[in-house]
Amino acid sequence: MKQTWRWYGPNDPVTLSDVRQAGATGVVTALHHIPNGEIWSVDEIQKRKAIVEEAGLEWSVVESVPIHEDIKTHTGQYDLWIKNYQQTLRNLAQCGIYTVCYNFMPVLDWTRTDLEYVLPDGSKALRFDQIEFAAFELHILKRPGAEADYTAEEIAQAERRFATMSEEDKARLTRNIIAGLPGAEEGYTLEQFRQHLATYKDIDKAKLREHFAYFLKAIIPVADEVGVRMAVHPDDPPRPILGLPRIVSTIEDMQWMVETVNSMANGFTMCTGSYGVRADNDLVDMIKQFGPRIYFTHLRSTLREENPKTFHEAAHLHGDVDMYEVVKAIVEEEHRRKAEGSDDLIPMRPDHGHQMLDDLKKKTNPGYSAIGRLKGLAEVRGVELAIQRAFFSK
């Protein structure tokens, strides 16, 4: 695997020097300062690429070129935003950047309720608490019809939880959910959030798939033409939330994408922490079935709790993800490619490390502190080395 590291640009508290010292050779970044929908110019791409290369690194993957909400709802100037997206892909290819991670999650990107969940060893992790989320949706957001998405027991638990919350607790929970996490391109006030949710009132899973298919049929031929590989990121968490449909959550969704636009430019990001939240997702089977189309991997693990919809981010080699079998399947896919004459390594980044050690005293991007990811990268690197030596050394 090609070892990479997500970097949020010049304002990231983790520097490119830190990235290089961690042992990564590739950088995963994006032009976050450019508003959603606007074209990334060759000049802006080259400026960022030069900064990365001056540090002795390579810009390996774009994460992400965000998709304007008009495209997802098929309203407003969606055709203009698609044309702009096409041009951005052409410009990236002109600059020698050929792997693009993106997602099609409506309104919100990845969602958590607690950004500072304290683990038994004192480090901090990200957590999604189903009951706290229900408390937000039922008693703070007050979304009409939300009760239908929860069991009677969950509704009762959410009411009790809400009753114990201080005003600061409510404000923090609201911020965590709607204010935008690292990599998310949209942040909202509560009223703006309600308005954005309302735009999906008549959009179910079938309709959102229809809009996604329209996007893919416009984008993938351009990507194919210029040599760009599109790698869709799964929903996080991989199930409907807030009354919004989710359409990249299961192996069936992956198969639908391939059947909708059967081009090798139409590929996947294997995010084990997102897909792995669902017990019915067999990660190794996903890799084996769609290996030739996996162009990027996010390796992390989560641990489901007593309520299986509640989870927190575990250490990279613990939790519900069998990281050994996952890495072995990825390495096998790379060797399959090599046997066919390709030396195409799959970029991998350690995802969402714990906040730990000296980083506990620093201001960090949630999930993206340096030391926890350094630990995760080192552990995954060790697993890969052992697999390479045990099964593939001559």
Curated annotation (Swiss-Prot):
Pathway: Carbohydrate metabolism; pentose and glucuronate interconversion. It is an enzyme of class 4 (lyase). Gene3D superfamilies: Divalent-metal-dependent TIM barrel enzymes. One of its GO terms (molecular function) is ferrous iron binding. InterPro entries: Man_deHydtase (IPR004628), Xyl_isomerase-like_sf (IPR036237). The keyword Lyase applies. GO terms for biological process: D-glucuronate catabolic process. Its EC number is 4.2.1.8. It catalyses: D-mannonate = 2-dehydro-3-deoxy-D-gluconate + H2O. Keywords: Iron, Lyase, Manganese. Pfam families: UxuA. It comes from the Bacteria. Its cofactor is Fe(2+); Mn(2+). PANTHER family: MANNONATE DEHYDRATASE. NCBIfam families: PRK03906.1, uxuA. Belongs to the mannonate dehydratase family. HAMAP family: UxuA (MF_00106). Catalyzes the dehydration of D-mannonate. This is Mannonate dehydratase. It comes from Salmonella schwarzengrund (strain CVM19633).
